[in-house]
Amino acid sequence: GLKKGVSIPDVGDLIFTSESPSFSTDELTDFHTTSRTFSVYYPDTRPDRKEPRYSIVASINAKWQDWQKLSDEDYSKAKNRLCEESVVALEKIIPDIRDKIDHLEAATPRTIQHYTHHASGASFGTKFEGLDVSSQLPDHAPGLYHAGSVGIIMSGWLGTINYGVITANKIDRFLRGK
């Protein structure tokens, strides 16, 4: 989360970054991956707030086996490393972002497993079956929108959040006649 009263430029809603010279599924899931997605939430996603606020979520692929047996000390160090590496990557997009951060935390497969009891800390569920149906609803029934984990090219809790933000913006534009 960013500090009250600060702002950032509009750099897009979803930003995919990687230092990898080429696509590699091994690199994407490596414990030290440089690949991440930033989801940027702007004040216009919550227009009724008295104080405009910004929030940024960094998403990184992870394997349960890399996290499950870490000691508490190593686990804490690895989470701190993820946070720092994410801020460094974000600074390439928003150079002064570090000074604007108010709250920073990391969730891992262990976090997901602890709170959801999903096997091996899995955060994703279904695949893309619902994307076309979901995105075409307003074409068939103006004003009818769907948000959920099957409505975007990612699923589970992260897909639900991201698709919810995208859908909320579409609804806002519909209601405002834009």
Model regions: which residues?
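Mid-domain catalytic core of redox enzymes
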Residues: G1-K50
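Glycine- and acidic
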Residues: D66-D74, H146-G151
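Flavin-binding catalytic cores
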Residues: G5-V6, T33, E51, D74-R110
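Short connector loops/turns at beta-strand edges and beta->alpha or beta->beta junctions
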Residues: N61-Q65
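Short glycine/proline-enriched loop/turn "hinge" motifs that connect secondary-structure elements
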Residues: R46-R53, S134-H140
